[in-house]
Amino acid sequence: ADTMRRFQDTMESSYFFMQSRQLDDFLVLNYIQEHIDTVTLTEISKHFGFSLSYCSKLIKNTTGMGFNDWKKALRIRKGERLLVNTTDTISSISLSLGYENTETFIRIFKKETGMTPGQYRKQSQQNLQ
C-alpha cells in the first residue's frame, strides 16, 4: 500500500509538472505574439522570471525553432494577415511588426514567401475575386 501511495504521488507530481510546463509554453508563446514588435529573449526571461537558457529551450522544444526564427516566422505570418485584411501601407505594417525600416521587412518577407509584400497583397486580392 505504501509503494502504491508513493507511485500515485509520483504520478500526480509528474502530471502537475507537465501541466505547469504546458502552461509555461502557452504563456511564453502568447507573450511573444502579443509583443512581436519589440520582444527579446532577455525581456521574456525577465518577465517570467525564467533563465535565458530555460526560455530558449522552451521555445525550441515547443516550436521546433530557435527564438529568432520563431519570431521571424510570426512576424511574416502577421504581415501576411495585415496585407490581406487591411489597407495599411507596407511601411506602416513594417513598423507595426517592429522592423527598423521598410526595406528590411520587404527583403525578409520576399526571402520567406518568394514575393514582395506588394506582390503578396496583389495576388491575395486576385485570389479573392
What is the predicted role of each segment?
Residues 8-20, 27-40, 47, 58-63, ...:
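Basic, amphipathic alpha-helical hairpins
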Residues 26-34, 61-102, 122-129:
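Terminal helix-turn-helix DNA-binding modules in bacterial transcription factors
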Residues 19-22, 70:
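Non-catalytic, surface-exposed connector residues within folded enzymatic/regulatory domains
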Residues 11, 15, 113, 117, ...:
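C-terminal alpha-helix/helix-terminus motif
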Residues 1-8:
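Catalytic-core segments of nucleotide cyclases and related cyclic-nucleotide turnover enzymes
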Residues 42-71, 94-119:
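Basic/polar phosphate-binding segments, predominantly the helix-turn-helix DNA-binding elements
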